Amino acid sequence: MARRHTRGLWITSAGLPQTGHAGRVTQPSLASSGHRVLGGPSWRPGQPLDKRGLARLAAEQFDLLTHAQCRAAGLGWKVIDHRVRSGRWTRAYPGIYLTRPGRDDPLTTMTAALLAVGEPSALSHESAAYLHGLRRMPPQPHLLVPAGRAPAPPGVVVHRTRHLEARVDELAWPWRTGVEHTVLDCADLASMTLDEAVDLVARACAQRLTTPAQLGAALAGRARHRLRADLVDVLTDVGAGAES
């Protein structure tokens, strides 16, 4: 099966990514006040930022910059506007600039949505499943945000939770939910059948991204999961098969 490397992911000819050694960025950073996230851009608000640092930040963010980041590096409103008007940059979302126009690969598309929604947030559901190599890329980015957050930009599907921090993979960039919660989030979607959910569980375990025990532990905290009873049985069967 043919595959190509795209900034930390191996994209197969079937359209599913395979994680590579560069799939995690481990520079220390803070997702928000009180939310510790280890992966992500090396620059954080409040830190000094020069033009060279801005270029490095764009590279870390798949050629994307936020308006706040540009301003922190000393770019004035007129400079930013000129770069957009001249076609040197394009707007991915309001306040989000693509510094290499025409780039539309999955990582850029999803990171643009993540930056547009703002912190704290993480790619979730089918978007996170794509990044974990479990599903095809969905037509719209899915993000998990804290309960009570404002509406998302057009074209972005937002899911709200009171447990965001506990469900985010602390090492991955772009920020995303961990494998166990990604599988359970997808299985909780009304559009996913039980057979599809079982296949997703089996695939995650077969790829050794997680185990039935780890999935069961995550499921234990989801009393209202629509497939809870079915998944308990499935995880028991999968676990028994793995031990035999």
Feature names for model-found ranges:
Residues V238-S244:
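Acidic-basic catalytic patches of nuclease active cores, encompassing PD-(D/E)XK
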Residues A2-L231, D237:
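Short gly/ser-rich loop at a beta-strand->alpha-helix junction or flexible surface loop bordering the NTP-binding
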